[in-house]
Amino acid sequence: MGFGETFKALSDPARRDILSLLREGRMSAGEIGAHFDMTGATISYHLKILKKAGLVFETRDKH
């Protein structure tokens, strides 16, 4: 993870909005998607870029 990946991740307004939303606490991809007019695939794409840049991390809950 370098500066290039971080700046790329932060260059998109939707990704900045996702980060702002996540400041409130942990959320699932579905919960994040409920706040935006985007498909689940688009939310996943943005989250992948944010994860690659080290700006968010993923945890999985056992059911």
Language-model features: where?
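Alpha-helical residues within the helix-turn-helix
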Residues: 33-34, 45, 51-52
